[in-house]
Amino acid sequence: MSTTQRIAAILVRVVVALMLAIHGITRIRLGLVDDLGVFLGEHSFIPIPNVTAWVITLVEILGGTTLALGFVVVPLCGWFTIQLAMGVALVHLQHGWFVVGAGEKGMEYSVVLITALIAVALLHYPVRATSQP
């Protein structure tokens, strides 16, 4: 992989990871973690939704930061891919494709993040201890 390709891969990884971390930070700052727990309790099979909401939020913050730094890349990409796919299934799918414009609350943003996470995971597979690429 060339230096330019490495920089591009790192840029995608860092930006996606920081977006996920900011999402968790914002959920805490706005006091929305309990709301997520209520939503999960009403719309999913999760037995302890409030605890799960906190786990999701903390993994977004700590896992997003860890991913941005280039550690535990493949497992974190897997976690976030599953988390986002569940978000698509539970929230966004019923609203269609578009997030804004022709619709709202759609799945297009989540699909882009999922695709980027899969690409980042593939670039780091098999699992390596370093942040390369």
PLM feature spans:
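Extended, low-polarity transmembrane helix blocks
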Residues: M1-R29, N50-L58, L62-P133
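Membrane-interface interhelical connector segments
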Residues: R29-I48
